[in-house]
């Protein structure tokens, strides 16, 4: 329904669609170019008046294929030049969409990709306007992994319709309940399946020239690795200034050696590594430009080390 210049769709259901999109070469036009041309304004300086509202869009058993024919195939690796999606299912609501403001609610999106990627569920609420962009209720589920974020927000000012980068401020929180590397094999083909899954929680704030990771908590599911700390990073005219407080790194030489072997079996570690036993470190590291300072306390089963190290340009100082 088109009313008062707005395209309003109360409900739409699409079942069993099969889309085939391609480019003959990387530089040639795609086979859907005529659609893009029909939607684009002839006057490049004219503001789009498109207004769209979809109360409910349901997709079931869809498939999409995209190829650039002169690009090589990689059957077990995810390849943006050869994408093949199957079993696409989605429920999407778009209360409003205009050039100046948008609200999109993805209740569910799932699909399988030929490289092995299996997206079980993606859901989120996304909005933007001339003052802010927000991502709420983000949930991503793979067969053995789950990532969540209650809120990611970006505020800014606009000048002549464009975001003024120097006014940007952002904040957010990420909760990776579990990330299993077997789910990412299509992106990281060399990594083996039996690397211990990891969990991560982090909160952060920042602006145009700085970021403050207020809390960072990384640990393996088997507790073989625990990393807790916070980081501040700022950029000025002379380069980057950074400070990292490491509240705790806890692991063992055995766990580290096993993980390195799973990542790259060709790396051979010295036999004495296992005798180090448990590892515990706490400390601080900071720097600016070419200066680095490390201060900390390293404890192991074979002894303790008080670490005081600094580097300025090409000179290294050990206390």
What are the residue ranges of the model-derived segments?
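Long, compositionally biased, intrinsically disordered segments
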Residues: 172-174, 184, 193, 198
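Transmembrane beta-strands of outer-membrane beta-barrel pores
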Residues: 16, 63, 108-110, 142, ...
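Short, intrinsically disordered, charge-balanced linker/junction segments flanking boundaries
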Residues: 1-2, 290-292, 313-319
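Secondary-structure transition motifs
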Residues: 1-101, 117-119, 145-157, 165-169, ...
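Transmembrane beta-strands of outer-membrane beta-barrel proteins
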Residues: 13, 136-138, 173-175, 214-217, ...
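Amphipathic hydrophobic-ligand
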Residues: 1, 8-9, 71-90, 114-125, ...
């Amino acid at each position: 329904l088109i009313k008062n210049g707005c395209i309003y769709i109360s409900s739409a259901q699409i079942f069993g669609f099969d889309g085939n999109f391609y480019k003959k070469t990387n530089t040639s036009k795609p086979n859907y170019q005529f659609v893009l041309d029909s939607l684009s304004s002839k006057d490049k300086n004219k503001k789009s008046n498109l207004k769209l509202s979809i109360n409910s869009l349901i997709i079931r058993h869809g498939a999409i294929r995209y190829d650039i024919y002169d690009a090589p195939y990689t059957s077990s690796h995810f390849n943006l030049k050869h994408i093949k999606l199957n079993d696409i299912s989605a429920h999407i609501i778009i209360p409003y969409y205009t050039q100046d403001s948008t609200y999109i609610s993805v209740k569910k999106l799932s699909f399988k990709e030929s490289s092995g990627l299996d997206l079980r569920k993606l859901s989120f609420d996304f909005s933007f306007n001339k003052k802010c962009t927000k991502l709420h209720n983000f949930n991503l589920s793979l067969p053995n992994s789950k990532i969540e974020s209650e809120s990611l927000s970006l505020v800014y000012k606009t000048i002549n319709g464009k975001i003024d980068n120097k006014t940007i401020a952002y904040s957010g929180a990420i909760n990776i309940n579990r990330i299993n590397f077997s789910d990412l094999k299509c992106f990281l083909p060399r990594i083996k399946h039996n690397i211990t899954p990891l969990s991560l929680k982090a909160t952060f704030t920042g602006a145009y020239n700085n970021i403050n990771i207020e809390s960072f908590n990384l640990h393996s599911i088997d507790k073989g690795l625990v990393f807790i700390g916070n980081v501040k990073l700022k950029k000025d005219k002379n380069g980057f200034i950074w400070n990292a407080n490491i509240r705790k790194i806890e692991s063992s030489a055995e766990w580290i050696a096993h993980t390195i072997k799973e990542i790259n079996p060709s790396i051979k570690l010295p036999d004495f590594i296992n005798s180090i036993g448990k590892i515990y470190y706490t400390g601080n590291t900071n720097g600016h430009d070419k200066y680095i300072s490390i201060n900390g306390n390293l404890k192991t089963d074979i002894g303790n080390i008080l670490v005081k190290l600094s580097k300025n340009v090409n000179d290294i100082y050990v206390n």
